[in-house]
Amino acid sequence: MEPKTKKQRSLYIPYAGPVLLEFPLLNKGSAFSMEERRNFNLLGLLPEVVETIEEQAERAWIQYQGFKTEIDKHIYLRNIQDTNETLFYRLVNNHLDEMMPVIYTPTVGAACERFSEIYRRSRGVFISYQNRHNMDDILQNVPNHNIKVIVVTDGERILGLGDQGIGGMGIPIGKLSLYTACGGISPAYTLPVVLDVGTNNQQLLNDPLYMGWRNPRITDDEYYEFVDEFIQAVKQRWPDVLLQFEDFAQKNAMPLLNRYRNEICSFNDDIQGTAAVTVGTLIAASRAAGGQLSEKKIVFLGAGSAGCGIAEMIIAQTQREGLSEETARQKVFMVDRFGLLTDKMPNLLPFQTKLVQKRENLSDWDTDSDVLSLLDVVRNVKPDILIGVSGQTGLFTEEIIREMHKHCPRPIVMPLSNPTSRVEATPQDIIAWTEGNALVATGSPFNPVVWKDKIYPIAQCNNAFIFPGIGLGVIASGASRITDEMLMSASETLAQYSPLVLNGEGLVLPELKDIQKVSRAIAFAVGKMAQQQGVAVKTSAEALQQAIDDNFWQAEYRDYRRTSI
């Protein structure tokens, strides 16, 4: 459902003069009307011409095109964001296909690596371990009283780049930009946070420009006590906030999610968001290839928290489609660097134990090795779906893909590792090795593949198709928790918007130009499920839709009226 055009009410603000021009959430730059310039002491502080936001956006677009590298484009866009947020979002929404990879993956990875070098202006909250006893004061310093979404990281596992210390702040900033651009959540309601618990990245510790706490990372009880202090301070300041954990190391990600998901409205996008968008993609791809997801055999390369989170949601979805839990688990095979996860493998992590295969059931496999490699698994399982979350490039070899294709005429191959340099195989190779028959979705953006004079569009299995809609649905419904069923309703809704399913051709996921429409549909499904699950107050469908409309922010200037503080 398309958003209804809302008549914007005037905004009463107490700021004037240079202070107003330095306030990114309120600054209009050259779009201040003459009346506003008189009323807010801006006469002579701006050029004579009063511009529209579209005229400003056109100038910004011309300037943007003058930058030759992606990181320079990223820096330029961040500068606009820190100067005039409304213009930033108008520009991004006008050119979302071009700019999403610049404000988020893959370019944000380079921005995190160079965070201290390219730092210009503070955004968000930096909480160092040294300041742990000032947590309440730090959050009180945030000028926005009505924060509704926080994205927090500790910078330890940034994309596939590892420990970036305080540089990890680039991820919450970028993620929240997508909450607004794709999900219509007002930037005034968002807050990026980095927990600065030190870094084990020696290059950063030796860098004279590094702006974080120069100390090895705290661990164990010290770490968890620090995070708990943060959670309690957030609950005290904004008890109804949605808290998203982002890019925490595997050893901490699942424990933190399990510890706090029933204490504060929270989720982990790397685990749950990735799982939800992947399952939505698989539902659509399975329908396009013929049949249901429950009919497919699935092999994973990568058995960390993200891979196992996806696997568990797939199992839940196939149970919804009619499988028993035992049968659903027998169809999912997890491979890590030590081979196929089996019940005989030592040192399994807690979240891996339910995803093992019984070694006794593999006695008839065609292999001479005790360690069951990815090729062994593909040869014996004959999977319909191959998913890569290994973070290692090139592991989907030609031999493996061709072996898969021998037994599956329409293989679904999803190399999801980020950034592009870490992808398990390129779409170009996968299409060629399967004679143009594979359905491919990737974690990073790729251009369409041309093979034998045919164009193959490549869908990006981008969490931005999921988390903005979840956030909007939580805000609109007032949900106090995010349940697994809410996430699965988001996946099913995403699948319903697949052009490949709807039209028999095109991308397996919607085009970015439709992402706000998809986010609004996901918000409705998530809000409705929250009501059904008892974590949100029940309302009529019309009331829920109205709440979504009311909370959907658009990048338009409002008229200002002067008031005193």
Curated annotation (Swiss-Prot):
<feature type="binding site">
    <location>
        <position position="418"/>
    </location>
    <ligand>
        <name>NAD(+)</name>
    </ligand>
</feature>
<dbReference type="InterPro" id="IPR046346">
    <property type="entry name" value="Aminoacid_DH-like_N_sf"/>
</dbReference>
<feature type="binding site">
    <location>
        <position position="246"/>
    </location>
    <ligand>
        <name>a divalent metal cation</name>
    </ligand>
</feature>
<dbReference type="InterPro" id="IPR012302">
    <property type="entry name" value="Malic_NAD-bd"/>
</dbReference>
<dbReference type="InterPro" id="IPR001891">
    <property type="entry name" value="Malic_OxRdtase"/>
</dbReference>
<dbReference type="GO" id="GO:0051287">
    <property type="term" value="F:NAD binding"/>
</dbReference>
<dbReference type="InterPro" id="IPR015884">
    <property type="entry name" value="Malic_enzyme_CS"/>
</dbReference>
<keyword id="KW-0560">Oxidoreductase</keyword>
<feature type="active site" description="Proton donor">
    <location>
        <position position="104"/>
    </location>
</feature>
<dbReference type="GO" id="GO:0006108">
    <property type="term" value="P:malate metabolic process"/>
</dbReference>
<dbReference type="Pfam" id="PF00390">
    <property type="entry name" value="malic"/>
</dbReference>
<dbReference type="InterPro" id="IPR023667">
    <property type="entry name" value="NAD_malic_enz_proteobac"/>
</dbReference>
<feature type="binding site">
    <location>
        <position position="157"/>
    </location>
    <ligand>
        <name>NAD(+)</name>
    </ligand>
</feature>
<feature type="binding site">
    <location>
        <position position="270"/>
    </location>
    <ligand>
        <name>a divalent metal cation</name>
    </ligand>
</feature>
<dbReference type="Pfam" id="PF03949">
    <property type="entry name" value="Malic_M"/>
</dbReference>
<dbReference type="GO" id="GO:0005829">
    <property type="term" value="C:cytosol"/>
</dbReference>
<dbReference type="GO" id="GO:0046872">
    <property type="term" value="F:metal ion binding"/>
</dbReference>
<dbReference type="InterPro" id="IPR036291">
    <property type="entry name" value="NAD(P)-bd_dom_sf"/>
</dbReference>
<dbReference type="InterPro" id="IPR037062">
    <property type="entry name" value="Malic_N_dom_sf"/>
</dbReference>
<dbReference type="GO" id="GO:0004471">
    <property type="term" value="F:malate dehydrogenase (decarboxylating) (NAD+) activity"/>
</dbReference>
<protein>
    <recommendedName>
        <fullName>NAD-dependent malic enzyme</fullName>
        <ecNumber>1.1.1.38</ecNumber>
    </recommendedName>
</protein>
<comment type="similarity">
    <text>Belongs to the malic enzymes family.</text>
</comment>
<feature type="binding site">
    <location>
        <position position="270"/>
    </location>
    <ligand>
        <name>NAD(+)</name>
    </ligand>
</feature>
<dbReference type="GO" id="GO:0008948">
    <property type="term" value="F:oxaloacetate decarboxylase activity"/>
</dbReference>
<keyword id="KW-0520">NAD</keyword>
<feature type="binding site">
    <location>
        <position position="247"/>
    </location>
    <ligand>
        <name>a divalent metal cation</name>
    </ligand>
</feature>
<feature type="active site" description="Proton acceptor">
    <location>
        <position position="175"/>
    </location>
</feature>
<feature type="site" description="Important for activity">
    <location>
        <position position="270"/>
    </location>
</feature>
<dbReference type="InterPro" id="IPR012301">
    <property type="entry name" value="Malic_N_dom"/>
</dbReference>
<comment type="subunit">
    <text>Homotetramer.</text>
</comment>
<keyword id="KW-0479">Metal-binding</keyword>
